[in-house]
A protein has these predicted regions:
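N-terminal interaction/assembly modules
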Residues: 1-128, 132-150
């Protein structure tokens, strides 16, 4: 498990954005995750190593859990054909949901807020509310249910 308590909120945001860039490249080019990270390391300040470690961790979690995450998105995107959701929105949802569900060091509400903020920066004007709706539905259905069961 990755420990990210040493990262500042700004570094965590950068890690999420870097992870988004990597999975975007993988989605469009089918390139290798390791090669994509190596290329990014060559072009970024090496002092960001912890940022890259967390980015790599998020990408790996996304890759390992993509089928489960996509099913969650499909079930909660009423009246939307999954394939018609913009690529960027799908990728932001995948990353944010993976972090919310599988990264215990991040409170679920932070994952939701980060997904919404990243959508405002990288996607369409309607994306942030769409992403917020899906994330909130998953949180209410699954995460809160886990907390009550515990």
């Amino acid at each position: 498990r990755f420990i990210m308590h040493d990262l500042t909120p700004k570094q965590k945001r950068q890690a999420r954005i870097t992870a988004l860039q990597v999975i975007y490249a993988l989605e469009l080019q089918g390139s290798n995750m390791d090669a994509t990270f190596e290329h990014m390391l060559d072009t970024k300040d090496q002092s960001e190593n912890d940022v890259f470690k967390y980015s790599r961790h998020l990408c790996a979690l996304t890759s390992q859990n993509i089928d489960e995450i996509d099913e969650l998105i499909k079930k909660r995107s009423k009246n939307w054909d999954f394939e018609r959701i913009t690529i960027m929105d799908r990728l932001i949802l995948r990353l944010s949901l993976v972090e919310m569900m599988f990264e215990d060091s991040v409170p679920p509400k932070v994952s939701i807020t980060e997904g919404v903020e990243i959508a405002k920066q990288f996607s369409t004007s309607d994306s942030s509310s769409f992403i917020n709706g899906i994330m909130d539905a998953v949180y209410n259905d699954l995460v809160k249910g886990k907390e009550k069961a515990a």
